[in-house]
């Protein structure tokens, strides 16, 4: 691999990381917007930090940091930054695999906790504005009512509940949505993992090539 190949690899790695950095900025900005507007509220009162805004801010920040290291490491041909980029990608990949395994192993327990969390939050619909906004959004988007049905609303279903006797509860409707989109979720997850592995491979290759070039130039 000559100098021309080194430059090509360097700019390819920089370009893709720059795109990811821009995506991270957009995700972070949207997350901050949701936090400021408090649009979707809190659905699980026992996990108040688990809101769409918080999740997007965390994900966007991580993407920006990792992509920044990749950009600077590639364009500056800095081995320390490249290895930091590689290690962070590896840790993220391991975390994703660990999370997938835990979700599979504890699927029933997680389902139980989700149902309990939903049943608890529905009791605070009229007393907590964030909880009310979250439930109104979920019910209007999924066209569902309550956790298991409209009977969950003791004082009567709110206006966000769709009318009709055969309306499903949001718990089953959410499960149905997840299962119907499982293939697409799996494809996106695999694509993300492949991109991460490619990024790690490019970083290692560029790092090794920098060593070879330095040795050839007697540096």
Curated annotation (Swiss-Prot):
Ranges annotated as spanning the membrane: 12-32, 55-69, 81-106, 182-206
Ranges of the Extracellular topological domain: 33-54, 107-181
Domain of life, per lineage: Eukaryota
Residue runs in coiled coils: none
Main location: membrane
GO molecular function: identical protein binding; protein-membrane adaptor activity
InterPro entries: Tetraspanin/Peripherin, Tetraspanin_animals, Tetraspanin_CS, Tetraspanin_EC2_sf
Keywords: Cell junction, Cell membrane, Glycoprotein, Membrane, Transmembrane, Transmembrane helix
CDD domains: CD53_like_LEL (cd03164)
The UniProt record lists the keyword Transmembrane: yes
Tissue expression from the record: Spleen and thymus, B-cells, monocytes, macrophages, neutrophils, single (CD4 or CD8) positive thymocytes, peripheral T-cells.
PANTHER family, alphabetized: LEUKOCYTE SURFACE ANTIGEN CD53 (PTHR19282:SF39), TETRASPANIN (PTHR19282)
Family listed: Belongs to the tetraspanin (TM4SF) family.
Subunit structure: Interacts with SCIMP. Interacts with CD45/PTPRC. Interacts with IL7R. Interacts with RBL2 and PPP2CA.
Protein's UniProt name: Leukocyte surface antigen CD53
Organism: Rattus norvegicus (Rat)
């Amino acid at each position: 691999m000559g100098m021309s190949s080194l430059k090509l690899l360097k700019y390819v790695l920089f370009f893709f990381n720059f795109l990811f950095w821009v995506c991270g900025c957009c995700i972070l900005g949207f997350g901050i917007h949701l936090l400021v507007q408090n649009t979707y509220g809190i659905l699980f009162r026992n996990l108040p930090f688990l809101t769409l805004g918080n999740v997007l801010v965390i994900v966007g920040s991580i993407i920006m940091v990792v992509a920044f290291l990749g950009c600077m490491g590639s364009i500056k041909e800095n081995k320390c930054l490249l290895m930091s980029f590689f290690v962070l990608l590896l840790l993220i990949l391991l975390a994703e695999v660990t999370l997938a395994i835990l979700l599979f192993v504890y699927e029933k327990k997680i389902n139980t906790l989700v149902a309990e969390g939903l049943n608890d939050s529905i009791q605070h619909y009229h007393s907590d504005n964030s909880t009310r906004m979250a439930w109104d959004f979920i019910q209007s988007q999924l066209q569902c009512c309550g956790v298991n049905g409209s009977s969950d609303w003791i004082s009567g279903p709110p206006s966000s509940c769709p009318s009709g006797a055969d309306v499903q509860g949001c718990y089953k409707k959410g499960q149905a949505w997840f299962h119907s989109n499982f293939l697409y979720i799996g494809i996106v997850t695999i694509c993300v993992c492949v991109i991460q592995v490619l990024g790690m491979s490019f970083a290692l290759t560029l790092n090794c090539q920098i060593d070879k070039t330095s040795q050839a130039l007697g540096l």
